[in-house]
Amino acid sequence: MLFRSWLAHGRTNSILHNGFGVDEERRLLTEITAAITEATGRRPLGWMGPGLTETHHTPELLADLGYRYVLDWTNDDQPYPLTVPGMLSVPYSVELNDLLLFGKGFTGPEFVQIVIDQYEQLSADAANGSGRVLALALHPFVIGQAFRHKYFDQVLAYLAERPDAWLTTSDDIAAHYRSA
């Protein structure tokens, strides 16, 4: 089965979203949302600011545009509501970001072990029935390199074999949290 959802991540990753005035940010977010909706046929429900940046107004502006969650807050392994009505924070992890790990010289086998270690701890933490999110931040130009492919396959195989793992999308995580 193919899992996919479209997440807004800015116009480019080099235009950070800090320092915008409210009107300028609203215009930019509206343009980005329209472009994604036109290209995919589906309005995005989630947002991740370029470089995890936002202004004090970003969550409210996103809610006004129909977004339901952000991934800019890396402070928890579980979703939680923001102070803006209807908005959630869905977990994201900079620690499991392929760009950062491989950029710091980690090897393929080390990447596999890091993901396994993360899974094992989160699984233990979730033993009380309260799920945890293992977010893998992957970039095709990094993990997609031919010499890294077998390590990515190992990670996916390991996670797919875990009986308590739910391989899903951030849209589905947000929907599940809201339904609980």
At which residue positions do the language-model features occur?
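Short, solvent-exposed loop/turn segments at secondary-structure boundaries
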Residues: 18-23, 102-103, 145-149
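Active-site-adjacent pocket scaffolds in enzyme catalytic domains
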Residues: 34-38, 42-129
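Glycine-rich phosphate-binding "P-loop"
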Residues: 10-29
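Hydrophobic faces of well-ordered beta-strands that scaffold small-molecule active sites
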Residues: 6-9, 45-47, 69-71, 88-90, ...
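Aromatic/hydrophobic pocket-lining residues that form the small-molecule binding cavity
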Residues: 25, 29, 112-115, 152
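C-terminal domain-boundary segment and adjacent tail
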Residues: 69, 116-180
